[in-house]
Amino acid sequence: MKALSKLKPEEGIWMVDAPKPEVGHNDLLIKIRKTAICGTDVHIYNWDEWSQNTIPVPMVVGHEYVGEVVGMGQEVRGFTIGDRVSGEGHITCGHCRNCRGGRTHLCRNTSGVGVNREGAFAEYLVIPAFNAFKIPDDISDDLASIFDPFGNAVHTALSFDLVGEDVLITGAGPIGIMAAAVCRHVGARHVVITDVNEYRLELAQKMGATRAVNVAKEKLEDVMQELGMTEGFDVGLEMSGVPSAFHSMLDTMNHGGKIAMLGIPGGEMAIDWSKVIFKGLIIKGIYGREMFETWYKMASLIQSGLDISPIITHHFSIDEFQQGFDAMRSGQSGKVILNWD
């Protein structure tokens, strides 16, 4: 089968002829229709320090996808051949305290599809049936293929009450932009998103952000004043992993504010903890999606009218995968879809 593999320990991704995966007793065999390129895939392409320390070579990569069930193990229940599915990319152990307690997203033994095990950039993917999510008929393949990053946005945004609140999002990558759309949809008042990438700030504005602020040109405090905000942001969503962005968030949070952190700093990050203490801030780390509450919320949000389709800016056939990676690496894109049909 066709597949995209991290074939060598250097910059790049390669098209290979890979063996079709075998189906275990509790597995689904999925024929891939569409995949999306994640920021993680770009890290793997670039072969940065994280990738060098994490990714086995060679390995098929990719973890954002939608496809059709074409085979299943003899123990699988609840799925039929022809079901349209996406899937949770974090494969959990089922045995640790968090898994047994129903907090599977906090499994300490998580293995990532396309990160620690064979991924979805292939004509066929095998995953445990437990990890598959049936896609409702009224949700398109395009949207279903980005449920993984959309889930990061939903999990982060819905960590705290947003109704009538003022929200600051630092980092206008695709996940931050989708989070802005979620915040507005569920009833936040002002949703301000910051970055230095004009292309993505414009995209965030289209997706519902009250203000998209280029912090290289405009002060966040001036924007707050223009919006009539006198006491700071109630909720912060840190999506960038950039220390200066987090420092700015701490400066502009209201007392008693709540921060959800999804962005991963490149290394240790020093902050002024006195601001956290004296403001009484709550900081929550976010990793992945809640299994599977976030997945049901994603489907329900779209079915209730949330439109995240503008975040998808490019489509390529799988044979044009290099153009897709070039678009993602340029920073001048939203989500990039690769078509396998």
Swiss-Prot record:
The EC number(s) given in the record are 1.1.1.103
**Bridged cysteine pairs (disulfide):** none
Say which enzyme class the record assigns. oxidoreductase
Task: Say where the protein is mainly found.
Answer: cytoplasm
Q: Where in the cell is it found?
A: Cytoplasm
* Cofactors, names only: Zn(2+)
Note accompanying the cofactor annotation? Binds 2 Zn(2+) ions per subunit.
Report residues binding NAD(+).
175, 195, 200, 262-264, 286-287
Pathway noted in the entry = Amino-acid degradation; L-threonine degradation via oxydo-reductase pathway; glycine from L-threonine: step 1/2
Keywords, comma-separated and alphabetical: Cytoplasm, Metal-binding, NAD, Oxidoreductase, Zinc
PROSITE patterns, from UniProt?
ADH_ZINC
- Report the transmembrane regions from the record: none
GO terms, biological process: L-threonine catabolic process to glycine
Cited Pfam families:
ADH_N, ADH_zinc_N
| GO annotation, cellular component aspect | cytoplasm
Q: Which family does it belong to?
A: Belongs to the zinc-containing alcohol dehydrogenase family.
PANTHER family noted in UniProt? L-THREONINE 3-DEHYDROGENASE (PTHR43401:SF2)
Quaternary context? Homotetramer.
| Record protein name field | L-threonine 3-dehydrogenase
UniProt source species: Shewanella halifaxensis (strain HAW-EB4)
